[in-house]
Amino acid sequence: IVAHEHFQLASFRNLKGIHLNGRNPAAPAGFTGHVSRSCHSLEEVVKYKATCDYVFLSPIYDSISKEGYPSAYTTDSLQKARQAGIIDAKVMALGGVTAAHFPEISSLGFGGAVLLGDIWKRTGTDFIGHFKELLRTASLF
């Protein structure tokens, strides 16, 4: 578990760490645990990656959960970012991600993928089967 708010929770046992974003841009003074961060540009990845265990880069694809929130990147721009060492194993792809995107995300050098809308929109037995397929496909990373 990673706390995205209420960073005081990170002092409890079994929490992985904290997640920084625009509302919570800095770790508490003296915090020495796991830190991740949301980034919405390649410039932010360059700025924050070295001080985090990993970062989320979004939106890679048109958002599923946020209607009208389009991708901010082309495949070409992401390939160039990989070649420049910006995208690497510490960068996770977020935004519009489905299992069908895993091969491309992996080939672009991302360390993994973050799914929100693809999971949130599933219910019942469809959810369980879909989750099993995600686990099988995630072996690409």
List each model region and its residues.
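SAM-dependent methyltransferases
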Residues: 140-141
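Charged helix-capping and loop-helix junction motifs
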Residues: 69-79
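Electropositive phosphate-/nucleotide-binding environments in soluble metabolic enzymes
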Residues: 75, 99, 125
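Catalytic cores of alpha/beta
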Residues: 1-16, 40-51, 78, 82-87, ...
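Glycine-rich phosphate-binding active-site loops on the catalytic face of alpha/beta enzymes
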Residues: 20-29, 56-69, 102-137
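Short, conserved loop/helix-junction motifs that constitute active-site signature segments
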Residues: 28-32, 84-86
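Active-site regions of enzymes building and remodeling cell-envelope glycoconjugates
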Residues: 14-19, 31-37, 51-54
